[in-house]
Amino acid sequence: MHSNSTIEKSVNSLADSLVIRQLNTMDYSQVWHAMKDFTDNRDDTTADELWLVEHPAVFTQGQAGKAEHLLVPGDIEVVKVDRGGQVTYHGPGQLVVYVMINLRRKKIGVRQLVTLIENSIVSALTDYDIAAYAKADAPGVYVDEKKIASLGLRVRKGCSFHGLAMNVNMDLSPFLRINPCGYAGLEMVQTADLQGPKDTASASTALVKHLINLLKANNVSHQVGLPNENNKYHE
């Protein structure tokens, strides 16, 4: 038998734990299915995770997505997904961070998590003297009214998945084939053009330290590759 104090101590310890998982470049659908499996299989003994990845070119359309926002997808694959929001683009040179957090254990709501993620991005860009900001009416992070980072989350069983995408050093032209996040004419910008990080590795280092800080994670571990299904994602 575990005493209540032992269980509480274990839960508090897990609330402080965070796994940073480097996936390098990986197909969008493969990662999407893996994060759904991770979320479906996790329980109160599963540590929270951040997955860092770049995707080959793909448009993803959220649950609110309307076909008219896909202007000219052309030869780029379109994947309909289960996150909030409209259509966005992922491609090489963009840092994507998937945020798998047990919100009940952290005692935060999804709106608080959105704000935390936005603040982490703003802080990372501030380190490079980039004047970035969030908007109350349009999730994401902006510089001079141009969007530098997009955000889309889903919550299942009290746990978040999906996450953020920050433009680092990429071909931005595919964004012209869509209305990004459902906003016609919304301009996109990237860190490499603003004296910020020139590659996703540098951007990742800058961003992750602020995510760790704002998530109050004191027990951080680093892993490479998708979780091993045999361990059921438990610590």
Curated annotation (Swiss-Prot):
It is an enzyme of class 2 (transferase). Coiled coil: none annotated. Pathway: Protein modification; protein lipoylation via endogenous pathway; protein N(6)-(lipoyl)lysine from octanoyl-[acyl-carrier-protein]: step 1/2. The active site is at 181 (acyl-thioester intermediate). Pfam families: LplA-B_cat (PF21948). It catalyses: octanoyl-[ACP] + L-lysyl-[protein] = N(6)-octanoyl-L-lysyl-[protein] + holo-[ACP] + H(+). One of its GO terms (molecular function) is lipoyl(octanoyl) transferase activity. One of its GO terms (biological process) is protein modification process. Keywords: Acyltransferase, Cytoplasm, Transferase. One of its GO terms (cellular component) is cytoplasm. Disulfide bonds: none annotated. In the reaction, the free carboxyl group of octanoic acid is attached via an amide linkage to the epsilon-amino group of a specific lysine residue of lipoyl domains of lipoate-dependent enzymes. Catalyzes the transfer of endogenously produced octanoic acid from octanoyl-acyl-carrier-protein onto the lipoyl domains of lipoate-dependent enzymes. Lipoyl-ACP can also act as a substrate although octanoyl-ACP is likely to be the physiological substrate. Belongs to the LipB family. PANTHER family: LIPOYLTRANSFERASE 2, MITOCHONDRIAL-RELATED, OCTANOYLTRANSFERASE. This is Octanoyltransferase. It comes from Colwellia psychrerythraea (strain 34H / ATCC BAA-681). The gene is lipB.
